[in-house]
């Protein structure tokens, strides 16, 4: 009997792929975690029924969110990755000898463990001596940070469920405070067909923050 995995994009559209094997299916305190194998994409990770990444194409995301800001900023030494349980972004960052510290803040410890077991080619990035992994809520972590980071990469998942707090005005304000004056922040913004429930949320919060900071004399 064939096994298929389907990811709903809208009520009328879904992506389906034939599954060769299911390697893992567990429930953490935060979400359901599945690792499956397909002929088309190899191993892939799904959280609450939505594909996070696959062996075939994860490099596209990890390289884009890493190397573009690194090419723009002249002197990155301290980096914060919010999320990043799979280690893919950290794996790209450790190639830069100028970086002195990489803090990875991920609330779901089980997700880190699953990724270490099934995606060691990615989580090797978490084993570098410069990388510190904190199993903690990112918003709480950020509240005590002021001017600590040259680069913040928001590698969290969609703005629903347990990560919803990472897509609020308070969160972006905390990120802004944690950045140095010339710091850069990179964040995920979904494709339109995936973002029906949050199209109004992210831009409004960011724009409000930018307007407030301009009025306070910081650009």
Residue ranges and their predicted role:
Residues 2-4, 53-187, 193-200:
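The AdoMet/dcAdoMet-binding core of the Class I SAM-like
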Residues 11-16, 23-25, 57-61, 82-83, ...:
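A short linear-motif detector with a strong N-terminal bias
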Residues 6, 44, 184, 218-219:
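Ordered hydrophobic segments in well-structured contexts
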Residues 7-10, 21, 25, 54, ...:
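Generic structural "secondary-structure junction" signal
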Residues 48-49:
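Short strand-turn-strand beta-turns centered on an Asx-Gly dipeptide
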Residues 190-219:
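Substrate-binding/catalytic lobe of Class I Rossmann-like enzymes that use SAM or dcSAM, i.e.
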